[in-house]
Curated annotation (Swiss-Prot):
It is found in: Cytoplasm. It comes from Arthrobacter sp. (strain FB24). This is Imidazoleglycerol-phosphate dehydratase. GO terms for biological process: L-histidine biosynthetic process. Belongs to the imidazoleglycerol-phosphate dehydratase family.
Amino acid sequence: MSTNGSIAAEARTARMERSTSESSVLVEINLDGTGVSDISTSVPFYDHMLTALSKHSLIDMTVKATGDIHIDVHHTVEDVAITFGEVLRTALGNKAGIRRFGEATVPLDEALAHAVVDVSGRPYLVHGGEPAGQEYHLIGGHFTGSLTRHVFEAITLHAGICLHMNVIAGRDPHHIVEAQFKAFARALRAAVEPDPRVEGIPSTKGAL
């Protein structure tokens, strides 16, 4: 698969355009925002999840994507997650002065999700707790439950972060996915937040 992309970053903002034979994606973020978003991926439920991610992380986010959704939404969903991971990594820069770690437990009615984020520079995902069959549910007419894990895999790999995501409770497939996105948002918000008491990079190694 051929890819062409360009990234420009200033302060704690970043922008990337990524084009392949399967999709065209633009993502722009501001880590020091207020949760304002402009999302259009042609996958309505995914738009809803990304809007929630922006709102609850306080990361301003613009996402524009088109792709071969007439075949399957998988390519577009994953490529947006890849691009978001890349711009997140870029916007973080050398990670000096951030809190680095974040944790959140978020409910949505009967669903409850717990997320822990480490902006470590080492990509790793631990994802579990979803009820049997969650991956097969079609949510909003296009988004299959299995895509949730794919999104978090792509973000962690390309952002260089560690994420532990565990679904503690849940019955409704929509609620289970949304609780995870909101828990991730709150944990990410805490992890990337500047800590006025931290001087330099929050690692004994001196680099993240």
